[in-house]
Amino acid sequence: MSDVKKVVLAYSGGLDTSVILQWLRETYDCEVVTFTADLGQGEELEPARKKAEAFGIKEIYIDDLREEFVRDFVFPMFRANAIYEGEYLLGTSIARPLIAKRQVEIARETGADAVSHGATGKGNDQVRFELGYYGLEPNIKVIAPWREWDLNSREKLLAYAEKHGISIEGKQSGGSPYSMDANLLHISYEGGVLEDTWTECEEAMWRWTRSPEAAPDEAQYIDIEFQGGDPVSIDGEKLSPAALLSRLNDLGAMHGVGRIDIVENRYVGMKSRGCYETPGGTILLRAHRAIESITLDRESAHLKDEVMPKYAELIYNGYWWSPEREAMQALIDATQRRVNGVVRLKLYKGNVIVVGRDSANDSLFDQTIATFEDDRGAYDQKDAEGFIRLNALRLRIAQRRG
């Protein structure tokens, strides 16, 4: 079909990517290298290796990318307080650039001339993967099977798998009715009853978190320490980035934190309903904004809030490797040098409540000035009169004009 000789496939070992593996060999008569990323999705990855071996694959990559994922992708994003359309914490979006990066690296290591993914032609992930590929390797060949083949239903995929002797455990029954994606930051659910925007999902859908109703009746307090805008410890215990996010996930899940049910605007033009569990990320966002509230000056904080929606949109749409995202990241990171201190939070039945924040060396909160008691001349209230009159000048002129 083309002169493609070797393809690096993002491989999960599931139905879709197993069919893709066989289809690539059949259609392109090429060698396939499989790549499976451990991003903390909580799945056993050895079955993916065994399935690849059963296909006779000679080069199999299973990489533990959890620390890199949190350190180099999740934490930089949270320095920006990024939220897409007011609710989505970008758990799927932020994982794609790392997968694309590693695929390109493996292509270079193995001499592959193409990469392939299992994203459908209707979703955002095809865009995110491929913008990543081209942003890192401009001349790479990309194969997107869902845009080429006629296997456009689950029934056709199963028939193809059966025809070619592809083993798909549990393919006939017992599986989830939802399309799910998980990593250390979140788990997402789409499809099934969620395609009706009025129908509430069943409680059994949620895999990570307790319902707020079933969460403990007693609140739990935790302290999160930040250095340079990144969290470094929980309750005084220093943790690696991945271990810290995992701990926050456990704490948030126990207290029913981090569930959302939203309809979002996909980059490809349609609206899509999704449910997400992001327990650790929800806690982290609240804590980060709290430490910024005492360490960032007003204009820096407001500037960050102005650029954040565009930054979040870039990540959602797949432009992590773009020059504009990198420029915005440099601006954001420059604001974080003095974002140091500790935030105390109360977790209770789905709520994350900030109850304290402290920074020994970088706080801009001056109690002697802000107090309602006698400030001993630290703030001259008479100064406010001229400030108000100057700022009111344009309003008075406009009113006189009528």
UniProtKB/Swiss-Prot annotation:
L-aspartate binds at T120, N124, D125. It catalyses: L-citrulline + L-aspartate + ATP = 2-(N(omega)-L-arginino)succinate + AMP + diphosphate + H(+). One of its GO terms (cellular component) is cytoplasm. It comes from the Bacteria. Pathway: Amino-acid biosynthesis; L-arginine biosynthesis; L-arginine from L-ornithine and carbamoyl phosphate: step 2/3. GO terms for molecular function: argininosuccinate synthase activity; ATP binding. Transmembrane segments: none annotated. ATP binds at A10, Y11, S12, G13, G14, L15, D16, T17, S18, A37, G118. GO terms for biological process: argininosuccinate metabolic process; L-arginine biosynthetic process; urea cycle. Signal peptide: none annotated. InterPro entries: Arginosuc_syn_C, Arginosuc_syn_N, Arginosuc_synth, Arginosuc_synth_CS, Arginosuc_synth_type_1_subfam, AS_cat/multimer_dom_body, Rossmann-like_a/b/a_fold. Its EC number is 6.3.4.5. Keywords: Amino-acid biosynthesis, Arginine biosynthesis, ATP-binding, Cytoplasm, Ligase, Nucleotide-binding. Its main location: cytoplasm. CDD domains: ASS. It is found in: Cytoplasm. L-citrulline binds at Y88, S93, N124, R128, S179, S188, E264, Y276. Homotetramer. PANTHER family: ARGININOSUCCINATE SYNTHASE. Belongs to the argininosuccinate synthase family. Type 1 subfamily. This is Argininosuccinate synthase.
